Amino acid sequence: MNYLFFDIECANCYNGKGKIYSFGYLICDHNFKIKTPPCDILINPDCKFDPYVKKNILAYPKEVIKASPKFNEAYEEIKQLMTAKNTICFGYGIDNDLHFLADDCKRYSLEKIQARVYDVQKLIALALDRPARKLVIEYTELVGEEEKGTHKSDVDALRTMLVAKSIFVKDNKPIHKYFKD
């Protein structure tokens, strides 16, 4: 069984629709041995960046993002990653990320990506029997490392994996077993 941890960043969410500029991910096995190191698929969102995103979140030069393929060109790679055989996807607070994927699929008239996806934020609630907090807080507390202030989707995917791994190490139970399909 492979686990794909992912995170998404958007240029803006104007009119309630996310426009993706970064899909960060890593792949590991169910024992958390990394098979594919953290990677960002950069995407030209073909829209204006929210001023807040430009100032506080954008981790790449805008020119690099604008020179990247549009979502419809990156779609097959993302879909293949998320729907690969024996792969379960995980994110942190993933409702927004899944909404952003659906928004861009609709925007480009592409089929919605149907993947098996679980939320590590909910895993914390199930495994530790308490409400989960923001990723940076859980990362600092459960992993024991200080957050460095970056806002890259590949880094957030790695942090999400490390939080999930800390629960696996504690309970010695595959994390997907906490969830009922």
Predicted regions and their residues:
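N-terminal cationic-hydrophobic initiation segments that often serve targeting/anchoring roles
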Residues: K79-M82, S109, F168
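Hydrophobic positions within alpha-helical membrane elements
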Residues: N12-Y14, I124, M161
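Active-site flanking residues adjacent to catalytic metal/cofactor-binding acidic residues
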Residues: F6, Y118, V155
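Conserved non-catalytic scaffold segment of RNase H-like nuclease domains
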Residues: N2-A102, Q114, I137-V143, H151
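Short, function-defining helix-loop hinge/capping sites that tune catalysis or transport
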Residues: N15-K17, C105, A127, A164
